């Protein structure tokens, strides 16, 4: 690893809560000093609804227009391999609470990178931390009203619906 490691942060924004994203960015910044690439993968609706968070944390939203099962995971995986080849990072951090990324993690490790995982405590399966070189689980601060990006999007849609008047 070089004196200042090159670090990529790739976020499955459909799978982790906004407060976990904030905690991860804060911790990684404290550990490495800089995160060279910060990207969040998710739906167009989530990108728009969370643009303030992404802007504040300097996270580039990567809009996934496909709607099929695991389409966000696939978009993240394809981009991750492109970035590993082009950017030659020392560390790749994947923020997701699911274990779908096992083949991706193995391939990135083969390219010589340390692969860290970040997830939400209570959502992470038993096997998920074993996939990564290192894995950190963050508490979901539900008391503050933090939710997953999908949940927050659903709430925003419901809030925009016309109110019903009761007699």
Predicted ranges, named:
Residues 147-167:
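N-terminal regulatory modules in eukaryotic regulatory proteins
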Residues 14-18, 101, 143:
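Short acidic, S/G/P-rich loop/turn micro-motifs used as interaction or catalytic elements
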Residues 61, 92, 135-136:
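Short, well-ordered beta-strand core segments
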Residues 46-51, 120-128:
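Short, glycine/polar-rich helix-capping loops at beta-to-alpha or helix-loop-helix junctions
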Residues 125-146:
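Structural recognition of alpha->loop->beta junctions
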């Amino acid at each position: 690893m070089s004196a200042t490691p090159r670090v990529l942060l790739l976020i499955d924004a459909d799978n982790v809560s906004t407060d976990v994203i904030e905690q991860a960015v804060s911790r990684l910044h404290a550990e490495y000093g800089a995160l060279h690439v910060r990207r969040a993968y998710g739906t167009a609706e989530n990108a728009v609804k969370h643009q303030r968070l992404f802007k504040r944390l300097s996270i580039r939203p990567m809009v996934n227009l496909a709607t099929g099962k695991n389409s966000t995971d696939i978009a993240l995986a394809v981009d991750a391999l492109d970035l590993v080849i082009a950017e030659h990072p020392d560390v790749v951090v994947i923020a997701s609470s699911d274990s779908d990324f096992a083949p991706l993690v193995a391939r990135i490790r083969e390219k010589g990178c340390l692969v860290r995982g970040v997830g939400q405590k209570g959502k992470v399966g038993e096997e998920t931390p074993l996939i990564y070189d290192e894995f950190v689980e963050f508490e979901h601060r539900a008391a503050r009203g933090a939710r997953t990006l999908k949940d927050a999007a659903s709430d925003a849609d419901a809030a925009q619906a016309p109110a019903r008047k009761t007699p």
